[in-house]
Every structure is written in structure tokens, then in C-alpha cells.
UniProtKB/Swiss-Prot annotation:
It is found in: Cytoplasm. PROSITE patterns: AA_TRNA_LIGASE_I. It catalyses: tRNA(Arg) + L-arginine + ATP = L-arginyl-tRNA(Arg) + AMP + diphosphate. It comes from Thermotoga sp. (strain RQ2). The lineage of its organism: Bacteria, Thermotogati, Thermotogota, Thermotogae, Thermotogales. This is Arginine--tRNA ligase.
Length: 546
């Protein structure tokens, strides 16, 4: 809100004075003596106008000098313009939050553009890992924020239910089933050794007895494929429910083969003369688009590669009407990006359609020591286990609070701590304190009137808190522009910090001063609205008592 207001005022001045439109930053300066907000617009304009940036800054300041939104405006260093905001402008933020309530922060940036976030996608061959958990939360937060900014968002999970890994899953389950029946069967090379398959096999023995004991044919293979798939997908959805995540679409890789999409795309590529046959396989001319080797689409045995079905999947996304798609992948898949972009180009799909957000890996820490992510063959720390230990709120918040581009160390002890050192506790405690203020006011007979006596707000802690409330929309736009959920958690930490400082230094509920109490309760109420909304966008609760 505040950044938008400053940007609009400055833009009007430079448009009128120089006939220019230019992108520039407005942000909170590093030190409070530099004002409430600062801009580098004069330096940006200096390059275009070939003028001294301080001279440009002086002209801008002169045009804004009489504006009641500012107590004063100062020029710093090479041409930074520092704004000291008026109490009137800051009080207006509180008024706006109280009027808009849960609508506060919403802005129609996307204008209904149809976008898709695809994340959490995995082979349904085992439980979600903590790495999947990080990806799911990144996708959830970005989806929520994009909706808040006026985009038509679809959340989608791609189910890799075709190909050799599903056959290996079926063979692995069949081996476990036979082992329980006393038949020695080896899990195939590259198969799945996790204990979770023993549990499914045990259920099968109870359900069908020895029907498929030491028997393997097409019918048996299909039975074990479907059984394993259904059980794994059901388990994955249970985990998603536990972490508080849901998808609009679960898209089957197998469906792309069954409905003819893969063949349609292969035919399109052949017609565009970007494929060729060699050694009995069909290859895409990746090298015609980027400096990379050509890739196989159809193997010599006639089966499709993952690359082929992935191209078909993204072609179908385009045909479904999405203007932009955002795939969230682990950083180990970065090599797949250029060849996918080459494939999109080969299909004449716009360059800005296909986008990938990469995230780094997760390491768990307990008692100051790194937790071994893998115990014995086929076993690893699952997302379910992490959720059981630290709970949904801490899991979601901790995954959101680290930049996706940074390797994450998830401190289990800190996530469980009921102390102000725990970031999610710190923010939630601010919300609980606010709720308690209103209970306290009622007990002390202080009558609350919403929106009244805001003119009494203006000390240093109140100003910082009001300014931070005015930065909520800016934080949301940073999340969207940088694909960084941590921009929202950083904002909430800052807002909670400024509230705790205000709460600690000042008497908020004072029966001897009901008007000032009202003003401060209104500021607290506005803060609670924004904290609650920010936490909701992350999928974290806002408790009223702690």
C-alpha cells in the first residue's frame, strides 16, 4: 500500500517533468535515520537523462515538498531520496486495514490470467520425503499468493504412473507378497525395498490368501500394479491432508498415452521435421535449438521415454488454456530445463509459457547433529514422520521461511520449541497477545470502538508498526516476482517484531485513558488482521491462546 502510494506520486512527477516512465525501487532503508522509505529513482533516471542524479533528486523533492503525505524528504549520498512519512498517511494504513479486513493486501495484478503450478509430482512408488514436503509448501504458498494477486490458479500434481518404475513397483510388491507366503523371491534390480511394501503385502495376504503364490503373468502383473498404485496414491493423499495441502487436478501420465496425446505430439514433431530415427529409436533434434545433444523420444523397443511423455504433458497444458505454467522441481532436475524449453520451441509454444522454479535439498538436524536421512536399504525419513514429530504449523512455516535457492537445514528441536526463538511460535504468539488484549480490555471495562481515535497514534513504535502494516502488499508482490515464499515469512517476522516492541514498551489497555487505549487497540486489531492473513496464506493457524 505505502510503496504503491509513493511510487505513484514519484511516477507522476517524473512523467510531468521529464516525460519518462522508468522502473525504480521503493524500499525500507537499512537505518531509521534514513527515513521510512527510500527510492533510487534519481540514479535510474540519471542514466537515461545523462544528468547528475542529485540534481534530479532535488527537482523531484521540490515537486513533492508540499505533499501532506510527508513530514520531510531528504537527499542522501549519490541521489537516494529518503521519505519521512506523515502520521496522517500512516494512520490511513490502519484505517484501510480495518475497512478491508481480509481483503487487505489483495490486488488485481494478474487480471484473471490463467496459470498453473505443478508441484509435489513424484513417482507413486514410495512415501513423500521431506524434500517433497519442501516442494509442496513452496507450491502451496505461491499458489495462494498468486490467487491473492488476481491470477486464476490451478494446482496440479503429475502422477508418473506409466513406465518401467511402475513395473518394478509391481514386481517388488509381488516379491514381498511371496516372501510372506514362504516363497523365496528376490526384489528385482532397481526395485523398491522399503518396509511400506511389506505392509501392503501383508494386507494382500489377508485379502486374497495365496491366489498369486509363485504365479506371474500379465494378469498378475496388472493386479499388482493397480494394487500398489492405488495404495501408494491413497497414502500420498493422506499425507497431503495431514500437511494441509490439496490439488485441483491429479494428472495421470498414463492417460496421455491412452488418450492419444503422446502420439499426436509425436506426429506434430515429425511434421515439423525436428525428429529422426537412429538405431531403431526416435530422436528429437534438441541440438537444432540449443547447444545440447539430441534426446531419445521413443526407445528401440517402442516404449516412450519420460522426456516424450513430459513434452506431451506440457503440450496438453498449453491446449488446456494456461497462459503460463510453473513447474517446481528439485535442483537435481535442472538439466531437464533446456531440453524441455527446446521441445516447447519445436512445438511453437511461446517462450514465456514454460517456467521452472528450482529448490535445493533439505537436511534434518536434531540435538545439533545432522540426522541420517537414510537408515537401512529402502528406508528414509518420511514427510509423515516429520509431521508427527513437529506438527503441521511448524513444518509448513519452516519450509516456507528458507529461500528455495538455498540448501535448507531443518532444525527439529527449534521447530518443536515453545519459545520466542522459534520463528513460527514468535509470529503466532504476537497474534495470541493481540487476542488477549481485547479480553483484557473487556475485563477492565474499556469500551472498544473500531476505527476511532486513530489521530492519537504517532510515537516511534506505533509509527514503525503502522509502516510495516503498509508493506504487506509489497511483500506479496515480492513473493510472486521472486518465487520466494520466504519473503512472506520475513515480512511476518518483521511485523511480529514491531508488534512485540510496541506491546512491551507501551500500556495498551489503560482504563484511565480510554481514548488512547482505543487507538492502540485499533492498531493491534489491524496487526492481528494482517498476521492472521499472512499465516493463512502459508497454511498456518493463528491461535488465540498459547
Amino acid at each position: 500500500m505505502l510503496v504503491n502510494a509513493i511510487r505513484q506520486k514519484v511516477s507522476e512527477v517524473i512523467s510531468k517533468a521529464y516525460g519518462s516512465e522508468i522502473e525504480f525501487e521503493v524500499e525500507i532503508p537499512p537505518r531509521k535515520e534514513f527515513g521510512d522509505l527510500s527510492t533510487n529513482v534519481a540514479m535510474k533516471l540519471a542514466k537515461t537523462l545523462k544528468k547528475n542524479p542529485r540534481e534530479i533528486a532535488k527537482e523531484i523533492v521540490k515537486s513533492l515538498d508540499e505533499d501532506p503525505s510527508f513530514d520531510r524528504i531528504e537527499i542522501m549520498g549519490p541521489g537516494f531520496i529518503n521519505f519521512f512519512l506523515s502520521n496522517e498517511l500512516l494512520r490511513g494504513v490502519v484505517k484501510t486495514v480495518l475497512e478491508k479486513k481480509d481483503e487487505y493486501g489483495r490486488e488485481n495484478v494478474g487480471n484473471g490470467m490463467k496459470v498453473q503450478f505443478e508441484y509435489g509430482s513424484a513417482n507413486p512408488t514410495g512415501p513423500f520425503t521431506v524434500g517433497h514436503g519442501r516442494q509442496i509448501i513452496i507450491g502451496d504458498v505461491l499458489s495462494e499468493v498468486y490467487k491473492e494477486l488476481g491470477y486464476d490458479v490451478t494446482r496440479e500434481m503429475y502422477i508418473n504412473d506409466a513406465g518401467k518404475q511402475i513395473r518394478l513397483l509391481a514386481q517388488s510388491l509381488w516379491a514381498r507378497y511371496n516372501q510372506l507366503l514362504g516363497v523365496e523371491k528376490e526384489i528385482p534390480e532397481g526395485g523398491y525395498r522399503g518396509e511400506y511394501l511389506v505392509d501392503i503385502a501383508r494386507d494382500l495376504v489377508n485379502e486374497i490368501g495365496d491366489r498369486y503364490k509363485d504365479l506371474w503373468n500379465e494378469e498378475v502383473e496388472e493386479f499388482f500394479k493397480q494394487t500398489a498404485l492405488n495404495r501408494m496414491l491413497s497414502s500420498m493423499k493422506d499425507t497431503l491432508e495431514k500437511i494441509g495441502s490439496s490439488f485441483d487436478v491429479y494428472f495421470s501420465e498414463k492417460s496421455l498415452i491412452e488418450d492419444g496425446t503422446v502420439e499426436e505430439v509425436l506426429k506434430l514433431l515429425k511434421n515439423k521435421d525436428v525428429v529422426y530415427e537412429k538405431d531403431g529409436a526416435v530422436w528429437l533434434k534438441v541440438s537444432a535449438f540449443i547447444d545440447e545433444e539430441d534426446k531419445v523420444l521413443v526407445r528401440s523397443d517402442g516404449t516412450y521415454t519420460y522426456f516424450m511423455t513430459d513434452i506431451a504433458y506440457h503440450y496438453k497444458k498449453y491446449k488446456r488454456g494456461f497462459r503460463k505454467v510453473y513447474d517446481i522441481w528439485g535442483s537435481d532436475h535442472h538439466g531437464h530445463i533446456p531440453r524441455m524449453k527446446a521441445a516447447m520451441k519445436a512445438l511453437d509454444i511461446p517462450d514465456d509459457f514454460f517456467n521452472v522454479i528450482l529448490h535445493q535439498f533439505v537436511t534434518l538436524k536434531r540435538g545439533g547433529e545432522i540426522v541420517r536421512m537414510s537408515t537401512r536399504a529402502g528406508e528414509f525419513v518420511t514427510l509423515d514422520e516429520l509431521l508427527d514429530e513437529v506438527g503441521r504449523d511448524a513444518t509448513r512455516y519452516f519450509f516456507a521461511m528458507v529461500d528455495p535457492n538455498t540448501h535448507m537445514v531443518f532444525d527439529i528441536d527449534l521447530a518443536k520449541a515453545k519459545s520466542m526463538d522459534n520463528p513460527v511460535y514468535y509470529v503466532q504468539y504476537a497474534h495470541a497477545r493481540i487476542h488477549n488484549l481485547f479480553s483484557n480490555a473487556e475485563k477492565k471495562g474499556v469500551k472498544f470502538e473500531e476505527g476511532k481515535h486513530l489521530e492519537l497514534l504517532g510515537n516511534e513504535e506505533e509509527r514503525v508498526l503502522m509502516r510495516n502494516l503498509g508493506m504487506f502488499n509489497t511483500a506479496l508482490k515480492e513473493v510472486a516476482q521472486m518465487f520466494a515464499p520466504n519473503r512472506l515469512t520475513n515480512y511476518l517476522q518483521s511485523l511480529a517484531e514491531s508488534f512485540h516492541a510496541f506491546y512491551t514498551k507501551h500500556v495498551i489497555v489503560d482504563p484511565e485513558n480510554p481514548e488512547l487505549s482505543n487507538a492502540r487497540l485499533n492498531l493491534a486489531l489491524a496487526t492481528g488482521i494482517v498476521l492472521r492473513k499472512g499465516l493463512k496464506l502459508i497454511g498456518v493457524s493463528a491461535p488465540e491462546r498459547m
